[in-house]
């Protein structure tokens, strides 16, 4: 909770005078685990759920009172260097992500960090308009009720 919930709250609180003067925008980085966490990620899922509630509340109150937008993106499974290494440590081949069954990734691949960054840039920009208090899921299948464990990944 300290990293995923308290830290964003205190960062926003500290930056609020500047954000108010600049009519700024905050983008919290959540996770689809906020909705239906994988079985082994209970504490993480709770913290991301709390962040989502905070985003919705601050997105309303700070937008009305300070003209500061607060939104959140909830990435799904992202192909980070850490994720590649983690799966290799679980005994998977170095290129495990190149042939994913559609139960894990309907498109045959998982999200790339660059795709998340592109969407984050949009939500922080003025081009995203007056939208505030929204949580946007970045996943390739409906999230509610479907978040199977990918640890360990069964590619057989």
Predicted feature locations:
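Short C-terminal tail/terminal secondary-structure segment
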Residues: 36, 121, 132-156
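Active-site loop immediately N-terminal to the catalytic Tyr-X3-Lys motif
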Residues: 36-42, 65, 108
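Active-site loop-to-helix junction immediately N-terminal to the catalytic Tyr of the SDR YXXXK motif
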Residues: 37-45, 57, 86
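Active-site helix of classical SDR
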Residues: 12, 47, 55
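Residue(s) in the substrate-gating loop at a strand-loop-helix junction
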Residues: 31
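Alpha-helical segment proximal to the catalytic Tyr-Lys
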Residues: 17, 60-64, 129
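Short, small/polar-rich loop/turn modules that mediate ligand/substrate recognition or access, typified
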Residues: 64-69, 131-133
């Amino acid at each position: 909770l300290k990293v995923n919930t308290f830290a964003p709250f205190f960062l926003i609180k500290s930056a609020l005078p500047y954000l108010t003067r600049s009519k700024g925008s905050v983008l919290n980085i959540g996770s689809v685990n906020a909705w239906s966490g994988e079985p082994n990620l209970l504490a993480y899922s709770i913290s991301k759920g709390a962040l989502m509630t905070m985003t919705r509340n601050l997105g309303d109150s700070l937008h009305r009172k300070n003209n500061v937008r607060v939104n959140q993106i909830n990435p799904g499974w992202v192909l980070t260097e850490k994720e590649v290494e983690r799966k290799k440590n679980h005994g998977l081949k170095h290129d495990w992500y190149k042939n994913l069954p559609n139960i894990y990734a309907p498109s045959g691949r998982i999200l790339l960090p660059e795709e998340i960054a592109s969407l984050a840039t949009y939500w922080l920009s003025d081009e995203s308009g007056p939208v505030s208090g929204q949580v946007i899921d970045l996943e390739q299948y409906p999230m509610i009720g479907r978040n199977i464990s990918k640890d360990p990944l069964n590619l057989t």
